[in-house]
């Protein structure tokens, strides 16, 4: 049981309607230094759980500059503001994409990182390095890097969960939209890729 904690969270409006009365909500971008300064000034922030960032692999290939700017610059702004306010605890949402083309499967924590295969993956890999360097330079920081694959599921209210506008970038929401009739079918393209089933589309 966790007691005596007053959670504060900031996002761009996705979950505001689901937050209970015990949460203080701010709609803000991590690129907005003034907004972050105001949040840290108003609250004694002890720990940051950092899930903010763009995350669509395919989109990152089409919009690399936007991904590097948002994910890397935003995290630098967040870390700098946190440091100024004495908050040196961060849990960072990284990604299994940092493994690139893994040497073995299933991937374990002993699997070495490889070159990422897309800009999204590179932002996560670079941020892991930046945060590791931050700790090396100042070991008062406590930094946790979470490398996971696509989490799935939704809040029971249906207000929080992956329900993308337009065509989904990940497989499960695509299948879910077919199941509820939003999309007609799941397309399978190609049959000669070097994958077990011959298809080239993977759930990033």
At which residue positions do the language-model features occur?
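Conserved beta-strand segments of alpha/beta enzyme cores
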Residues: 22-24, 142-144, 185-187
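Catalytic helix-loop patch of NAD(P)-dependent Rossmann-fold dehydrogenases
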Residues: 62-80, 84, 88-89, 98-150, ...
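NAD(P)H-binding glycine-rich loop region in Rossmannoid oxidoreductase-like domains
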Residues: 27-70, 81-84
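A conserved pocket-lining segment of Rossmann-fold NAD(P)-dependent short-chain dehydrogenase/reductase
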Residues: 60, 112-113, 149-204
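Active-site loop signature of alpha/beta-hydrolase-fold enzymes
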Residues: 33, 54-57, 98-99, 151-154
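Residue(s) in the substrate-gating loop at a strand-loop-helix junction
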Residues: 95
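N-terminal Rossmann/SDR dinucleotide-binding element
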Residues: 1-47, 167
């Amino acid at each position: 049981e966790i007691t005596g904690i007053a959670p504060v969270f900031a996002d761009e409006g996705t979950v505001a309607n689901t937050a209970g009365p015990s949460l203080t909500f701010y709609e803000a971008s991590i690129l907005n230094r003034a907004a972050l300064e105001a949040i840290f000034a108003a609250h004694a922030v002890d720990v940051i759980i950092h899930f903010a960032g763009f995350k669509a692999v395919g989109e990152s290939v089409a919009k690399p500059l936007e991904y590097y700017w948002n994910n890397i610059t935003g995290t630098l702004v967040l870390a700098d503001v946190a440091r100024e306010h004495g908050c040196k605890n961060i849990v960072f949402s990284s990604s299994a994409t940092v493994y690139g083309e893994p040497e073995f499967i299933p991937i374990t924590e002993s699997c070495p990182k490889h070159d990422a295969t897309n800009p999204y993956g590179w932002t996560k890999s670079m941020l892991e390095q930046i945060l590791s360097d931050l700790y090396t330079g100042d070991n008062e920081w406590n930094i946790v890097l979470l490398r996971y694959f696509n989490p799935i599921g939704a809040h029971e209210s249906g207000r929080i969960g992956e329900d993308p506008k337009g065509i989904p970038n990940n497989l499960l929401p695509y299948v879910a939209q077919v199941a509820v009739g939003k999309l007609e079918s799941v397309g399978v393209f190609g049959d000669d890729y070097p994958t077990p089933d011959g298809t080239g589309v993977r759930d990033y």
